[in-house]
Design a protein with these regions (language model features):
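N-terminal secretory signal peptides
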Residues: 1-10, 18-28
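Bacterial signal peptide processing site
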Residues: 32-34
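Bilobed "Venus flytrap"/periplasmic-binding protein-like clamshell domains
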Residues: 39-65, 70, 74, 124-191, ...
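A structural signal for short loop-to-beta-strand junctions that line the ligand-binding cleft
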Residues: 111-121, 147, 245-253
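A bilobed periplasmic-binding-protein/Venus flytrap-type ligand-binding module shared by bacterial periplasmic
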Residues: 125-136, 232-236, 248-270
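An extracytoplasmic/periplasmic, membrane-proximal ligand-sensing/linker region
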Residues: 180-184, 190-191, 201-214, 219, ...
Length: 323
């Protein structure tokens, strides 16, 4: 997305600040937003991780662009499932989540607490990481193995369980099951305390790349189970991790899932529009926060189905061609 001319940038900044102050109309829609009832709190993710990096950058962008007295609070969390619990429970006003988890949580929720999307951010790819010198090649080889499926509260533990079910193993078919976050799983694989671990993140994920720099790894190819998973859960798609991403022997077929930026229906249209408008004004900063965010743009950002876009976000996308 190309940057705005300086005069336009100043005009939009003034409009954005007015949106949170509740005193001006935003763009062609001429809406009159009100200030948030509570300070912005963003449910982020684990450290190190793309979620927490993007959440911190968004907090800085919103503080600067919207003239807030202080940066929004960023919460370190286990990931998507916890983020959605925080959002729907009112402890967070903004959250990042995998779209599958968001859609599951949103089922049956109506009214002010209904989760609504501001934007599709980027796509996560599920990694199943093993040592390259191991005999593990497919999910079926993990039968009886020591495997970390990710921590409770993360978005990738449900994916791990669905993949294992599709492979005919299930969680009970593992030899030992651990629920480790990425740093702990990384350390356990290095120390030979586990044989494999699941992780879902942008490509490349820094923690996996650092591991691959010190320990030759392989990602299990998921091609033999992807059709079965997608038949049951069409929200997923097929992704590929190129060989040069982590120095792999070859490209690997993986499961892909979209990540979305969310608020609830309780947020007024002007504030929602101001948040996403400011984010796109500084999209290059998001890309600097994580290589995964390079793909964020206003054309792909509307792809949040089955989670509906917030009306304020719709206003932004409908008028984005004017920017």
């Amino acid at each position: 997305m190309s940057g705005p001319r300086s005069t336009l940038g100043l005009s939009r900044r003034a409009l954005l600040r007015a949106a949170l102050a509740g005193g001006a109309a935003l763009g062609a829609t001429a809406c009159t937003p009100s200030a948030p009832a509570t300070p912005l709190v963003i449910a982020g993710g684990v450290r190190p991780g793309v979620y927490i990096s993007l959440a911190g950058t968004l907090a800085d962008i919103w503080r600067e662009r919207l003239g807030l007295d202080g940066a929004p609070q960023v919460l370190t969390t286990a990931g998507s499932t916890e983020n959605m619990q925080l959002l729907t429970g009112g402890a967070a006003t903004v959250a990042i989540s995998q779209v599958d988890v968001a859609a599951d949580v949103a089922t049956g929720i109506t009214g002010p607490g209904e989760p609504m999307a501001l934007a599709r951010l980027y796509d996560d790819v599920t990694h199943v990481v093993v040592r390259r010198d191991s005999d593990f090649r497919t999910l079926d080889d993990l039968r009886g193995a020591r495997v970390s499926i990710g921590p409770a509260g993360s978005g990738y533990q449900p994916i791990a369980l669905r993949l294992l079910d599709a492979a005919g193993i299930g969680a009970d078919g593992l030899g030992e099951r651990a629920e480790l976050g990425l740093p702990e799983a990384d350390a356990a694989l290095r120390a030979d305390r586990i044989d494999a671990f699941f992780w879902s993140g942008g490509v490349p994920t820094g923690g996996i790349r650092d591991l691959a720099d010190e320990l030759p790894i392989r990602l299990l190819d998921l091609g033999d189970v992807l059709d079965r998973v997608r038949q049951r859960f069409p929200v997923y798609s097929v992704g590929t991790v190129p060989a040069n991403t982590y120095g792999l022997p070859g490209p690997v077929a993986c499961l892909s899932v979209r990540n979305v930026l969310l608020v609830t229906a309780a947020m007024d249209d002007g504030t929602a529009r101001a948040l996403i408008d400011a984010a796109f004004l500084d999209q290059p900063r998001l890309a600097q926060a994580s290589p995964a965010a390079v793909t964020i743009d206003s054309r792909s950002a509307i792809g949040t189905q089955p989670v509906p876009l917030h009306p304020g976000a719709l206003q932004f996308y409908r008028s984005a061609k004017d920017y």
